[in-house]
């Protein structure tokens, strides 16, 4: 269904440090584009194969219109986690690298009995979550 998601940032180096740390517990690694011009203005995590023909990625970068990046009210991206521990590690890494807590790790039974999630704001204010489904107690 999706090809990619793109968030704007006003400080690419800071954002790269934040997402390298926050997404590592979820098993996500940086995309390689082999395009030096693109790599100076953006960074991605996930899959970027065959020059983008096979892409499922999360990107951050400087806005294309060269105006300041701003956050959307109500917008959020949630990354899939394979365990509660991955959610916990995502949250801890995000806070240790300039993020702020927007909802600590825990079950959100109002959504579903197996909805374990943590919510953070990245250094630019974008809302990001990690969610684990299919487990109802700590293992």
Where do the protein language model's features map onto the residues?
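Short amphipathic alpha-helical segments
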Residues: 1-5, 72-77, 116
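A short acidic/small-residue loop/turn micro-motif
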Residues: 109-110, 133-137
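Short, contiguous alpha-helical
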Residues: 119-134
